[in-house]
Amino acid sequence: AEKLVNGLEDESRESRLAAIQAVGMVQSNLAVTKLIEILNNSDFQDERLAATMSLGFIGDNRAIPKLNDLLNDDEPNIRWDSAIALAKMGEKTSIPIIENLLDRQYLMTFPELDYKEIDKVIMTAIETSTLIVDSTFEPSLIELAKNDQSLTVRDLAIKALKRSYDRTI
């Protein structure tokens, strides 16, 4: 893992990006401080997004303040992934963004997302809503379970309601 952490300082952008992703996959706590530095200093959105995701995979509490800052980032994917990372750590600060991600109409305001990607985002948000059970999510989950255009999304929402909220639809 130490070699991977050293790769975070590689001169090659591709190598750096690969190292950022790899330290997340192996959940290297050694990388947390360096990943936060990347978030503070990198001008590259792909590096910042990968660092955000890696901090979520690692799940180290030292990242919570930075992830909370990222909830207001200019880049939507970074806001979204920081919310998911925080939810994995049980942080309720993620709730408003996760709630937005359960809303198909909200997601359709992002022209860069196609229907397949929107479904994927919603399904990730449904799964995330089961990590940090909160009544805020219930109305959105019920709406998805009853009325969403995707049967896969409906099914996942039904299962989440049953498993986490003891609700049968």
Residue spans of the language-model regions?
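Amphipathic alpha-helical scaffolding segments comprising HEAT/armadillo-like alpha-solenoid repeats
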Residues: 1-9, 28-41, 60-72, 91-111, ...
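TPR/Sel1-like alpha-solenoid repeat signature
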Residues: 7, 23, 38-39, 51, ...
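Short inter-helical turns and helix N-cap capping residues of alpha-solenoid HEAT/ARM repeat scaffolds
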Residues: 11-12, 43-44, 74-75, 106, ...
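A short, hydrophobic/aromatic-rich structural module that often spans a beta strand
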Residues: 82, 139-167
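TPR-adjacent "capping" and linker segments in tetratricopeptide-repeat scaffold/adaptor proteins
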Residues: 111-117
